[in-house]
């Protein structure tokens, strides 16, 4: 790859983000300032105009540019009509849970008319991350990218931004309210999108706005791919081209060249595209994003759309367009589980001198967390006094180790900080279920049919090495995201985890370093991390309907003995509940 070619190619996507480009990371200060204004904005997609929450009137929202180790100050002004919080997804926020963002976990929400200043501390992150709302389903439209360049004095060549995001043709707030009230499943979105557009396979009114990427033959581009979807894993491919993955979740990987990627909600990937079509080739190629799902498609509604954008060669070395763009024939089918697993098993940490691998070899705390879809009895939240819309008149729920998380009325971090956690949360989240459950492929995977609500947390001493094995008992994949930490994905397997046999298969040499791991249906995934970030840290499935149903818990990491191992003081401007 010729290094001289890269800089001339940076601007075809970045030029539209004028405010971000005005602060060039190569010359900017180490402290960067942004103002986010939450507002209601009218947008048209799929021939319908609707009012959505946006940041600075943009959908997707503004991109934050920084360098590794920078300090970012974001003042969020809530000019919308509802409470809101913002989470900086994948930023570890060392010693600073106060600015992590999940509502009622680390802060009370920002009320309409209020504002809150977030302090975002970048440490080891380098590559692509993103920010999003962390309240109800607001992240459907309130989200944007975080582009983290290397430290000053160092370089890397991969700099082109592309994002993959969802679009809802039904009112998001109505969808969520209905699901909460009557306990049924959440209505699926009408389409997937790439950079806010569904593509030209949808109604005529959408075609003129199809996202297009202009490329020149022989050059190499970096796609910063973000799955901001609420409920779907995605396959992504570009017709006539292979893709080289060089990073995931802002951590470098050993380069792998593939025909497609599979990316879970919440994940980010840095992917190289070589524009290698030659004279006589078509000059237009679809990049396509398609839902990957393991649910029974004949009985459960889901978004089965394929979003498209167009890669278009603009130089004379390639023929001008004749007919429609080519479609990626190697894009996997919706239920291709083998294709999904084949991709994720290839991921490895880079592991060089500048980016070493430090996998903990000795584990202090072993946890086996069963992930399941359950039910709760229909209750007074159903204002119609009719049966709920879940199976057998119940409401849908979800659980970790048969605990369906219930949000408290005040935020947990404040309660912990002031020593007033009694009555707010319980410090007894179980390390494992007492009954061994085998995945069955039924609707609730053979786990407990009915679950119980609770606000249970796991308390860890500072420096504890933790291994968590996620055991998926359900018929659906689950992207599990941990705030405050990046972890090593040391193992995967199908069926029931065997604590005597399966650890021997772990990769302790160069496992991928991630903040979100996709746990396949009826399978398991093992992660390891060192609890060296004091504070309260949320862990949850990144399917938003599962968060609402209770597939969440928290780690409370105690302060260490030195000042550098203790939480930062509480900021004076924290929102009040």
From Swiss-Prot:
Its main location: secreted. It catalyses: 4 hydroquinone + O2 = 4 benzosemiquinone + 2 H2O. SUPFAM superfamilies: Cupredoxins (SSF49503). Cu cation 2 binds at residues 89, 132, 542. Gene3D superfamilies: Cupredoxins - blue copper proteins. Disulfide bonds: none annotated. The keyword Metal-binding applies. Its EC number is 1.10.3.2. One of its GO terms (molecular function) is copper ion binding. InterPro entries: Cu-oxidase-like_N, Cu-oxidase_2nd, Cu-oxidase_C, Cu-oxidase_fam, Cu_oxidase_CS, Cu_oxidase_Cu_BS, Cupredoxin, CuRO_1_LCC. It holds the Pfam family Cu-oxidase. Binds 4 Cu cations per monomer. NCBIfam families: laccase. This is Putative laccase-1. The lineage of its organism: Eukaryota, Viridiplantae, Streptophyta, Embryophyta, Tracheophyta. The gene is LAC1.
């Amino acid at each position: 790859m010729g290094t001289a070619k890269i800089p001339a190619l940076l601007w075809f996507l970045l030029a539209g983000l004028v405010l971000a480009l005005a602060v060039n990371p190569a010359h900017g200060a180490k402290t960067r300032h942004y103002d986010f204004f939450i507002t209601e904005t009218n947008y048209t997609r799929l021939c319908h105009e609707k009012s959505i929450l946006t940041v600075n009137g943009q959908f997707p929202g503004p991109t934050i540019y920084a360098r590794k180790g920078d300090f970012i100050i974001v003042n969020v002004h809530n000019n919308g009509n509802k409470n809101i919080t913002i989470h900086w997804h994948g930023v570890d926020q060392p010693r600073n849970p106060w600015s992590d963002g999940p509502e009622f976990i680390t802060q009370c929400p920002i009320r309409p008319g209020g504002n809150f200043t977030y302090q975002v501390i970048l440490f080891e992150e380098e590559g692509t991350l993103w920010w999003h709302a962390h309240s109800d389903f607001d992240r459907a439209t309130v989200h944007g990218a975080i582009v983290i360049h290397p430290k000053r004095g160092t370089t890397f060549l991969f700099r082109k931004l592309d994002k993959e995001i969802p679009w809802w043709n039904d009112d998001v707030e109505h969808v969520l309210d209905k699901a909460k009230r009557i306990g049924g499943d959440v209505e699926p979105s009408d389409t997937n999108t790439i950079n806010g557009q569904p593509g030209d396979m949808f109604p005529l009114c959408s075609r003129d706005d199809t996202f297009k990427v202009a490329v020149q033959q022989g050059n190499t581009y970096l796609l910063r791919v973000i799955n901001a979807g609420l409920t779907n894993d995605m396959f992504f491919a570009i017709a006539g081209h292979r893709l080289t993955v060089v990073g995931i979740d802002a951590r470098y990987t050993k380069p792998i060249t593939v025909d497609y990627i599979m990316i879970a909600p919440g994940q980010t990937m840095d992917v190289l595209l070589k524009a290698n079509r030659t004279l006589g080739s078509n000059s237009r190629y679809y990049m396509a994003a398609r839902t990957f799902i393991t649910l029974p498609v004949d009985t459960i509604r889901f978004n089965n759309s394929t979003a498209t954008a167009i890669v278009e060669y603009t130089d004379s070395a390639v023929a001008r367009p004749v007919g429609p763009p080519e479609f990626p024939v190697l894009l996997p089918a919706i239920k291709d589980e083998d294709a999904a697993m084949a991709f994720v098993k290839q991921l490895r940490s880079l592991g060089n001198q500048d980016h070493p691998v430090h996998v903990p070899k000795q584990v202090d705390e072993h946890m086996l967390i069963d992930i399941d879809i359950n039910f709760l009895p229909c209750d007074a939240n159903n204002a119609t006094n009719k049966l709920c819309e879940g199976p057998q008149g119940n409401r849908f729920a979800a659980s970790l180790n048969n605990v369906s998380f219930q949000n408290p009325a005040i935020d947990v971090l404040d309660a912990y900080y002031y020593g007033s956690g009694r009555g707010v949360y319980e410090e007894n989240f179980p390390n494992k279920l007492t009954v061994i459950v085998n995945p069955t492929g039924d609707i609730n995977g053979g786990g407990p049919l009915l679950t119980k609500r609770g606000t249970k947390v796991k308390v860890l001493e500072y420096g504890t090495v933790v291994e968590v094995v996620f055991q998926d008992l359900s018929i659906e994949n689950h992207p599990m995201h941990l705030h405050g930490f990046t972890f090593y994905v040391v193992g995967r397997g199908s069926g029931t985890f065997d604590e005597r046999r399966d650890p021997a298969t772990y990769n302790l040499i160069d496992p991928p370093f991630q903040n979100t791991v996709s746990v396949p249906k009826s399978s398991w995934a093992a992660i390891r991390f060192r609890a060296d970030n004091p504070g309260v840290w949320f862990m949850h499935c990144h399917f938003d309907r599962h968060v609402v149903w209770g597939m969440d818990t928290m780690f409370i990491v105690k302060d260490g003995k030195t000042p550098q191992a203790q939480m930062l003081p509480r900021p004076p401007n924290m929102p009040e509940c």
